A protein has these predicted regions:
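Class I (Rossmann-like) S-adenosyl-L-methionine-dependent methyltransferase catalytic domain
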Residues: 1-110, 126-205
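A conserved beta-strand element that flanks and buttresses the S-adenosyl-L-methionine
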Residues: 118
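Short catalytic micro-motifs in class I SAM-dependent methyltransferases
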Residues: 121-125
Length: 205
């Protein structure tokens, strides 16, 4: 399977050209990204029983998901966060991308909670301590559903993958549970405070 990989190196224009625009290396096509966004929206709206109004996209890169969100849900308030200076300089104003990371969410001037929180292609690059801190910050910002792309050591991945970062699925399960997350499958998660809105057989634990 392919990932929207975010390596630990420089997130400059060349990085995005290779992994997002070059047909030989890009991890997802525009059509595949659109299906991801449509699915995340549908899952969140099923949970909330209303249209999604606010989206937080952490690790947004150049904000490739922003135009898809606004096309599918005109009027949605999209906020992107990314550590890439290039992404913020090139797209920060037009796509509302702020400089920061999942580990620094608590230091950013963000809304108290978002209907849909997305973090795709970056969580598995964090150190164990950074991961624990990051997923707690994400839970604090999720007022509905989170779409958190996570892959484990047991998955067959293709992408810009740094050596030695993959961790066993059991580690992710323990860590996510300790951070208060409830899994729904297909990369969808809800914080414990939202678990009452999910049928018992839908929950992963």
């Amino acid at each position: 399977m392919t990932t929207g990989a975010r390596a630990a190196g420089s997130f400059d224009r060349a990085y995005f050209d290779k992994w997002y625009r070059d047909p030989l290396h890009r991890v997802r096509t525009r059509a595949e990204r659109t299906r991801q966004v449509a699915f995340a929206l549908a899952a969140a709206e099923l949970l909330l029983e209303r249209p999604v109004r606010t989206v937080l996209d952490v690790g947004a890169g150049e904000g490739h998901w922003q135009p898809i969100f606004t096309r599918l849900r005109p009027g949605v308030r999209y906020t992107g966060v990314d550590p890439s200076a290039h992404a913020v300089e090139a797209f920060g104003r037009t796509r509302n991308i702020r400089h920061g990371s999942v580990e620094s969410l608590d230091a950013l001037d963000l809304e108290a909670g978002y209907d849909l929180v997305c973090c795709v292609g970056m969580l598995y690059y964090l150190t164990p301590a950074g991961f624990r801190r990051g997923v707690r910050h994400l839970a604090a910002k999720t007022a509905g559903l989170a779409y958190l792309e996570l892959f484990a050591q047991e998955d067959d991945l293709i992408g810009d993958l740094p050596i030695g970062t993959a961790r066993p699925a059991a580690w992710y399960r323990r860590t996510m549970r300790a951070a208060g997350w409830v899994p729904l499958g297909q990369h969808c998660w809800v914080p414990a405070l939202m678990a009452h809105r999910v049928a018992i057989l839908e929950r992963g634990w």
